[in-house]
């Protein structure tokens, strides 16, 4: 086969690998927004798991109280509704403001915050699918799981936790598949993402260890050592927030059942 035909075929395959994830990510984003919006506007509020507790934490953050202070008068953490009514909750008090950023940026009632959360979470996952390359189907399979999808349709910490975790994994997979060695700018990108990863639910911070899959991408010893920086950033970010909220004890007998 002539050499120029071989080159054209490789170029075609490369373009195909890039176009397929793009189509999948777009279809996922549109489908998630449409189906999620239908559920938000016509679904039942009481079907949202712990929706009241997450909403109470959002109201608390909107009032400017980043670190909850314990009320001696009530046995739980409290926040005041817009009508002055006291709302008690405790199992979401330790959550970082980062996991509620859609509701903090797009202020409004529960439904508006639900739409904002859905759009932001679906967008993060769509980007993850787009950049994951040949691993796009794996990201998509996780994204369409009922646990993942239904956690995106109301203001919850799970929405950003799941979507951002998938985005972080996709970035690592993208760097793993790219031609050429790692550069310092890639380490900086991973460090920035790791700082944010440290602010999601503590159980997902372990995902930062995926960066060690990039060790074969470089022969430079300094670059190999620098891959530990994202891990350090993630666990430092997590530790600083946990230190600020270490006084909050969420015991089983004090967890909201709403």
Whereabouts are the PLM-identified features?
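Start-transfer (signal-anchor) and selected internal transmembrane alpha helices
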Residues: 1-42, 133, 224-232
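Transmembrane and membrane-interface helices of multi-pass
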Residues: 139-147
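Membrane-interface alpha helices of multi-pass inner-membrane proteins
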Residues: 149-150, 186-202, 206-213
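Short acidic/glycine- and proline-prone juxtamembrane loop motifs at membrane-interface regions
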Residues: 154-161
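Short hydrophobic alpha-helices at membrane interfaces in multi-pass membrane enzymes
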Residues: 171, 176-196, 224
